[in-house]
Amino acid sequence: MSEIREARLLKANSLVKKGFEPYAETFKITHSTKFLTEKFGYLENGQDFNLDVAIAGRVLAKRVMGKIAFYTIADQEGKIQLYLEKKILDDFEIHAKLLSFEDLKEIVDIGDWIGVYGTIKKTNKGELSIKVSKWEMLSKSLQPLPDKWHGLTDIEKRYRQRYLDLIVNPLSKNVFKTRAKCISLIRRWLDEKNFLEIETPILQSEAGGAEARPFITHHNTLDIPLYLRIATELHLKRMVVGGFEKVYELGRIFRNEGISTKHNPEFTSVEIYQAFSNYIDMMNLTEDLIRDIVLSCCDSLIINYQEKVIDFSKPWKRISMKDVVMEYTGIDFDSFNGDLNKAMKDLEESNIEISPKINTLGRLLNEVFEEKVESQLVEPTFVIDYPIEISPLARPHPENKEMVQRFELFIAGRELANAFSELIDPVDQRKRMQLQQSLRDAGDLEAHCIDEDFLQALEIGMPPTGGLGIGIDRLIMLLTNSPSIRDVITFPLLKPEITSTKSEKSTSNEVK
């Protein structure tokens, strides 16, 4: 690798000696590869079109055959072939201080960025090309690209060096184009329905709104601890109290938790709050929003995800947590009549392993659901009516005070969205937060803490409100058929790379 770098540094220095800059300041582009291929694909083989173009891209391939060369360059939108003749380039070189055909052969490597001027041509073999009249070096690459046939076989390297992954793997580039499109569509969809996008603090004095461990930092001037937000919920609810009836925030969330194919400590979500609504209204909103996003991004409401066919066109199933556990496991939690010991004994006899930390029937129900049911929910399914002890911010169910008006949406065996009829009773909310604080004091670092300012806001008065959170990264996984969350985050958090030796540093031929 160091020999290749040394050779390329020599080429960069040769440009300097000829009076050319190997790292250009700018280049004025007139067209993209996508525009040219779409606009001039109709040309007959061998036909020229006299349109002056200036185009730039990274060199991905080159073939030199005597006095003719064919290069392939890629920009953000696609690829195009360059047709280069020695006579044409050298004629221009005579009349102006330009780089020659020989310079091209000797200096340009795969991986370099070059800019070219020329006209449109379709070769005799039917390849749309730029007939180049002059060229410029825009950025000399000092390191070779991964082998084009084998690409990046090390999956970890794809994540660590995403720039290489994007160069050699068109599918990865498409993933992030889809991600950008999806996020733009969500914002537009909500804006058109008169939701107002709000920005809430990332640094917070209290980390609330979810059961999760926060990242902690320190503000030097104020000499206080601060937390990276684990949710936007409590601040968005304050905005509803303040009179904004339809609000949302799409942004980054930070949770100091494990890393897996489904979890990254830094992730993106959208939280949506709508006054005068309940969890049924938010269910309808969720179904409409995600269905529209799927259709816009995939051109179909039936998609393939990891060898599973998922149909978004049918009405989505809605089923209570108790009923879905009964359906998939045969366990009837109502038959326990509130007796936790009986439930634990029956589950043990059924060879279902349960954490010894489980201390309520509601938590036990949730544990069985997560262990035995969740992964089987492939088609879009709203699981509704959750235990109150795992939902401290949700409104109690009017027919069963041990449950709350909450749903989670599951697709392809993963949770994609979480929503409530929000708890707006300040007295009840204080009791729930006090219970959470006692759990936190007892060692549960994911339990909620008491947020006095939020409780004061509730006492001012919050209208009936439905709240919803959607995991953007998991949605992108579905839209792009990606098996891991790391595939859809540009630079996911990874374990530190272990290297046995320090990388060699070569300075002998640095560009002067």
From Swiss-Prot:
GO terms for biological process: lysyl-tRNA aminoacylation. Mg(2+) 2 binds at E415. It is found in: Cytoplasm. One of its GO terms (molecular function) is tRNA binding. Mg(2+) 1 binds at E408, E415. Its EC number is 6.1.1.6. Its main location: cytoplasm. Pfam families: tRNA-synt_2 (PF00152), tRNA_anti-codon (PF01336). It catalyses: tRNA(Lys) + L-lysine + ATP = L-lysyl-tRNA(Lys) + AMP + diphosphate. Gene3D superfamilies: Bira Bifunctional Protein, Domain 2, Nucleic acid-binding proteins. Binds 3 Mg(2+) ions per subunit. It is an enzyme of class 6 (ligase). Keywords: Aminoacyl-tRNA synthetase, ATP-binding, Cytoplasm, Ligase, Magnesium, Metal-binding, Nucleotide-binding, Protein biosynthesis. Its cofactor is Mg(2+). GO terms for cellular component: cytosol. HAMAP family: Lys_tRNA_synth_class2. Belongs to the class-II aminoacyl-tRNA synthetase family. Homodimer. This is Lysine--tRNA ligase. It comes from Prochlorococcus marinus subsp. pastoris (strain CCMP1986 / NIES-2087 / MED4).
